[in-house]
Amino acid sequence: MKTRIKKIYKHKVIHNSMDNKGRLSDLSSFLKLLKENLNFDFNINSLDDRIKLQKYVFIAKSFGLDLGYNYSLYIYGPYSPGLAKDYYNLNLKDYNTTQLEKRFNWSNFKLAVQGKSVKWLEISATALSVKETNPDLSRDELLDILIKIKGEAYDKKDIKEIFNEAINYGFPL
């Protein structure tokens, strides 16, 4: 089991590359969707907001929207330095969200993440990251690894509950 955990921390998830202008446009549209539909008014100065945005973008990939960011597993779950760079440099414009909504399963994504805490997003996104890195893990093995990774920060019962909720929302775990 320990060797698998080591692999997880060394693994870097590679996404399809996208030109920077298109990626920034999509990120702006995604932020607008989050603001209009989830009341998520991104504040760059809020650590919780930055963590939430990192997890929203990562989780959206499981619902069909890949914005082209590379992720590694960090203390708060999957983290993309490229995404951080983009949101620090983002000039929010009034982008059309209709086309973006059509590119992925927005309604299921919205149901899955609406009203969720930073803790919920962190644990569920970490589970997705571990599964993506180790697709052959059974759910029990995945849960065991998740508890080892997040067990110092969160209660085992909460981790199990969030893991099962994520499965019920259609996360590919």
What are these regions (language model features)?
Residues 2-173:
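Domain-edge interaction signal
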